[in-house]
């Protein structure tokens, strides 16, 4: 780009943050997927949850609204990053304690709409980013959608994507949050699917609920 010019003809080119998108941009983009005639999608991923709690809830709610409008797709939601991790200015990350994380996750999902078109997961995985040669924490919504896609392809859509045979999470070194039985009970009773690590089984999806807030024939992903 040396010697180049911007659209105004000036040479004061800047690139920092040029590809960054705000929550308004994401929500605006998601609106396009309400058009079922032009866009064919099965899974709507929340993607990055780097924003604060309220902003992340807004993006999650939009994903759900789009899936509800389409009625032929499912939204996959992860909590906001700060529910699990404390980032400091020197580039290191501290993982919050298990009780704080549990309360944060429950608080994040509590106001989200009850829906059969959404799937809520419990967190973040630690993985190797081969493009930047570093390890980083990423939200699990893409992985949960992946277990559903894999199950659709290798078995049938009405099979559960959870468990040790079909719910394996790939490319994961560890979890930011590995809920025990007490935490899993609290999460699952609040329509949140735990992702856990267990010796011998690795990291797996341990639940197959939809985001429906009441018992129903439609409160499971595989129905």
Model features per residue range: what roles?
Residues 1-223:
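A glycine- and small-residue-enriched flexible loop/hinge signal that marks low-structured segments
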């Amino acid at each position: 780009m040396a010697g180049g010019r911007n659209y105004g003809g000036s040479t004061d080119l800047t690139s920092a943050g040029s590809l960054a998108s705000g929550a308004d941009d994401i929500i605006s983009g998601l609106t396009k997927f309400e058009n079922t005639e032009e866009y064919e999608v099965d899974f709507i991923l929340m993607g990055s949850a780097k924003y604060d709690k309220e902003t992340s809830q807004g993006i999650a709610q939009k994903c759900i609204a789009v899936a509800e409008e389409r009625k032929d797709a499912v939204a996959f939601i992860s909590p906001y990053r700060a529910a699990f991790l404390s980032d400091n200015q020197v580039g290191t990350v501290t993982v919050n304690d298990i009780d704080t994380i549990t309360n944060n996750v429950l608080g994040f999902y509590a106001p989200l709409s009850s829906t059969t078109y959404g799937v809520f997961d419990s967190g973040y995985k630690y993985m190797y980013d081969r493009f930047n040669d570093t390890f980083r924490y990423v939200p699990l919504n893409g992985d949960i959608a992946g277990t559903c896609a894999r199950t659709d392809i290798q078995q049938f859509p009405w099979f559960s994507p959870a468990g040790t045979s079909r719910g394996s999470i790939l490319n994961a070194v560890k979890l930011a949050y590995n809920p025990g039985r007490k935490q899993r009970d609290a999460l699952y009773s609040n329509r949140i699917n735990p992702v856990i690590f267990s010796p011998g089984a690795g990291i797996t999806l341990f639940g197959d609920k939809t985001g429906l807030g009441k018992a129903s024939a439609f409160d499971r992903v595989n129905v």
